[in-house]
């Protein structure tokens, strides 16, 4: 049987953050391909201490994986929505059991936060432990592109088991193509507009005009050539966008993609590109 890991949580606080859109679309595609969801229900572990939360998540994953049999395949979207320090042990057990596991990578946390001086050492250590060991126990990996593949190979992952996705799907229910778009219209910026990810928004050049969509924008610092339209659910966002070209940019400078998130664009395929093309 072919499965995909479906993580379910009691509290979903990110409804208007497109961070879940890519994962949801992957699940939709896998469903259409005949994959079966292997559900993992995790309680609100934010109310637990660190040790209790780790034990709870490990037990939830272990319970789900016990349903898999020799010859089964499972696709896991990586990283897990909420990490488990013992995840690699579970993958090792699946391998011994004869279950084939595949990662579809959304982010490499060690790559994204390697230069983040504000991140506590214990969190960086956790990322290194959970990410590095897990990558070696799977049968195949879907990476973003050849640059990310190169990073994985440098980490010791066999190149022949890595496939490049190139770009994420952005599924739109009840799609209606817009016909009134003109290149002289404002530039679109959509996504997470918070200070730590998109500080460049407060130092953009005076031309052209920009239309902004997303969470975290500080309207009190809005520039004269910026129009903020608020935030929308991911499936509603494409029809709400007004403008010409979409801007794929992150970081604290409008001159170059700098900072933690700006540098990360060198390696990943931004989901914004999928949104704009859709």
Task: Locate each region found by the language model.
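N-terminal pre-catalytic "stem/leader" segment of glycosyltransferase-like enzymes
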Residues: 1-89, 95-102, 111, 115-116
């Amino acid at each position: 049987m072919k499965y995909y890991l479906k993580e379910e949580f009691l509290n979903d606080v990110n409804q208007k953050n497109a961070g879940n859109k890519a994962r949801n679309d992957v699940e939709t595609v896998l469903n259409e391909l005949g994959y079966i969801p292997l559900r993992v229900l995790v309680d609100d572990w934010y109310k637990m201490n660190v040790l209790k939360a780790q034990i709870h998540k490990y037990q939830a994953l272990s319970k789900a994986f016990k349903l898999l049999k020799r010859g089964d395949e499972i696709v896991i979207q990586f990283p897990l929505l909420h990490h488990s320090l013992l995840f690699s042990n579970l993958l090792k057990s699946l391998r011994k059991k004869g279950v084939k596991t595949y990662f579809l990578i959304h982010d490499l946390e060690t790559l994204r936060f390697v230069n983040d001086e504000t991140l506590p050492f214990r969190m960086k250590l956790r990322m290194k432990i959970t990410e590095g060991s897990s990558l070696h126990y799977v049968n195949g990996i879907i990476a973003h592109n050849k640059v990310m593949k190169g990073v994985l190979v440098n980490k010791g992952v066999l190149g022949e088991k890595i496939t490049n996705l190139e770009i994420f799907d952005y599924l739109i229910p009840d799609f209606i193509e817009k016909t009134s778009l003109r290149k002289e219209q404002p530039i679109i910026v959509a996504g997470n507009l918070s200070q730590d990810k998109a500080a460049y928004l407060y130092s953009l050049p005076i031309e052209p005009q920009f239309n902004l969509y997303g969470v975290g924008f500080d309207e009190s610092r809005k520039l004269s050539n910026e129009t903020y339209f608020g935030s929308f659910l991911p499936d509603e966002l494409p029809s709400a966008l007004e403008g010409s070209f979409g801007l794929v940019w992150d970081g604290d400078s409008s001159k170059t993609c700098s900072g933690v998130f700006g540098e990360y664009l060198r390696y990943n395929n931004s989901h914004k590109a999928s949104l704009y093309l859709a």
